[in-house]
Amino acid sequence: MKKHTESYWEGVVKSMGLVFGDIGTSPIYTLTVIFALTKPTEANVFGILSMVVWTLIILVTVEYAWLAMSLGRKGEGGTIVLKEILIRLLKPGRQIAFVGFLSFVGVSLLLGDGVITPAISILSAVEGLVLIPGLESMRLGTLILIAALIAVVLFIFQFKGTDKVAAAFGPLMVLWFGALTVSGLVSIATFPKILGAVSPHYAINFFRDNGISAFFVLSEVILCATGGEALYADMGHLGRRPIIRAWYFVFVALIINYLGQGAFALQHGDAKNFLFNMVQGQSQLLYIPFLILTILATVIASQALISGVFSIVYQGITTRIMPLMKVDYTSSHLKSQIYIGSVNWFLMLLVIFIMLIFQKSENLAAAYGLAVTGTMTITGIMMTIIFAHTTKKWKVPVAVAVTIVDVVFLISNLNKLPHGGYWSIILASVPFATILIWTKGQQALYRALKPLDMETFLLSYEQIYAKGKNITGTGLFFTREWNVIPPYVVHCIIRSNIIYERNIFISIVRTDEPFGLKSELKTGFGPGLDAFEIKAGYMEVIDIEKLLKKHDIQEKVIFYGIEDIATMNPVWRVFSVIKKLTPNFVQFNKLPASKLQGVVTRVEM
């Protein structure tokens, strides 16, 4: 969370580095892609610029900065937070199931987007090299190789933690937005009439004159708003106010640059890349420094997105919608600075694969946008339901209007499906299938295990304990709930008579708040039998050993259950493989290996 001592400008600069990289690098390719398909006549340029301005106002300012960011949980934002808010508001049943399904789709689309964004950002920046005198004949393969190498270096650096270099991200992005503003203003000065394009009537005229083709242009216009969802998703890192303050500056810089590119497009309609050609035309001397700044900005944008993917996956793990994975904490003072190796390398391979498949940023733009509009539509639907169930009912009409705009953009983006848009669906289907198999598998496994209730367990436990053949010391037994006894505990204590002088059932309960940590030792359930319950927020990092020491628990051995799944069902077979490949509960929580004792239970599913 944001420190209270942080100044106004510190918060703004940090936000620019951590939140606005993606949306801030959109000017590199947005208008270039649009005008490759639509001739840059005066009516078209004014109409499209008007659409860009109003897309940024409606989808980013209204939907995210105003509506979504008013829905935080202890300062946290994002799709999973919306789901947690809704679960509290709705009655159990179909509505909850629908919200769960929506949030799974939203999370999957965001994770799929985590592959396309770094690929298009880095490729589009590297393509600016061909405008440097002497490099005009650089081959496409060389450009892809340079982009792939930048991506590899970026992903290798993740393990070290970006804590040390993150301090430079903010100032670099301030420089980037400053450069966008200055180049935009210089270009606007050559054609001041372009400022009139902010009027919505040009967008309306464009729709009136072009009909259905104008509707499909929306699928390219959305490129200007990609990364808008980061305002809400990254709220937990910086707080609401610094992000909104920074957005005002970013918004102005983007609008000025898009208007400048529009003025340039009217005079140089045949330009290969409007941003790069515009800057090169203004100053040949400053073009190379600007290109270096562009590459740095796209790396920062990609970095923010990778950190966002780690954060989403961690939320998914702790809310039990995703399998456990090895998590490393790369910062001693920032809880949100995490690294998930398996996700990092998988993401790197996919980014390079996508670069090789699409080869050019304009080709990638054909696949880009579908996931973003899908995420925005889901956010709109979930927000509307929340406002309808709270005291903020007056926001419902605005949320409905914004969601309708989201749906219009989503439908226009369906046109991209045959042109590479299907990659968005393929990339999102991997996490979506994993989430579905994992959540359904966990439920089926819990039913198949047939756990005992505490009363039935105590009948046998007390008889065995009374015999007095108990092992000296303390034995810990991990259970999902302290009062529901899993089969492995029954096997250990009742069947095998492995019973200690002191036996403690330990359970971890994740609350629907992002942060907060409570631990409680409940004593006297039976002779030598206690329960230790840890309640933690779903973003909270738990040090179990520290909590045990705090309650003066000196454990001799820690028991945990391992399920050996036997099944003929192909879906449960996949679930079983995922379970075997991913760390188990005790590995995830980094407990001392010397004290651990896994107990295998064979389960028929």
Curated annotation (Swiss-Prot):
Subcellular location: Cell inner membrane
GO annotations of cellular component type: plasma membrane
Chemical reaction(s) catalysed: K(+)(in) + H(+)(in) = K(+)(out) + H(+)(out)
Keyword Secreted: no
Stored InterPro entries: K+_transporter (IPR003855), K_trans_C (IPR053952), K_trans_N (IPR053951), Kup (IPR023051)
Keywords: Cell inner membrane, Cell membrane, Ion transport, Membrane, Potassium, Potassium transport, Symport, Transmembrane, Transmembrane helix, Transport
Transmembrane segments: 17-37, 45-65, 96-116, 140-160, 165-185, 211-231, 246-266, 286-306, 338-358, 367-387, 394-414, 417-437
Chief localisation class: membrane
Record keyword Membrane present: yes
GO molecular function, one term: symporter activity
Bilayer topology term: Multi-pass membrane protein
Family classification: Belongs to the HAK/KUP transporter (TC 2.A.72) family.
Function text: Transport of potassium into the cell. Likely operates as a K(+):H(+) symporter.
Protein's name according to its UniProt entry: Probable potassium transport system protein Kup
Lineage, highest ranks first: Bacteria, Pseudomonadati, Thermodesulfobacteriota, Desulfuromonadia, Geobacterales
